[in-house]
């Protein structure tokens, strides 16, 4: 649990200045009470990031509406119950839906913290198709490409026969392709180490 808090804290440390820069550059409208900043957290799980982003942005005076999407009805119910206890259901909502087919409205910002495997790709596709101006995505595991690398032709076999090297190669390939696709459709992309491997 402590690792998750460190990840959320680091994510917020990156979100706020990036968001402020996008607002100052006119890429995202300055949030107001009538038109709050819209954020969708894709693959939110227990919504640590969803609640933290909501509460932190509100604490610095930013009008915001946050929607959390997770496939599990139990997560939706738990998160909506917490929102009700906090009295914030007018500015935060949760839905139990697949990311690829969510009914969530378009958003200014799409975030995803460790949406597993191809759920990260679903989050990117949803954000791009919905016209999100800012995406902050911290990918998780890359199992889909790992399976496809089982029978790697030479010279790749020299790398993929070792588990840790195969995993790293899969991570690099997947994230490089994601970044290239985002660049092709018009996004400026930065790839950074989000938080050290020990977390």
Cite the ranges covered by each PLM segment.
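S-adenosyl-L-methionine
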Residues: 1-29
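Class I S-adenosyl-L-methionine
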Residues: 9, 13, 71-199
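Structural motif corresponding to the C-terminal cap of alpha-helices
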Residues: 15, 19-26, 54-58, 83, ...
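Short helix-terminating capping/connector loops at secondary-structure junctions
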Residues: 25-36, 60-63, 89
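Conserved SAM-binding loop of SAM-dependent methyltransferases across substrates and taxa
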Residues: 46-61
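Conserved SAM-binding motif I beta-strand of class I
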Residues: 65-70
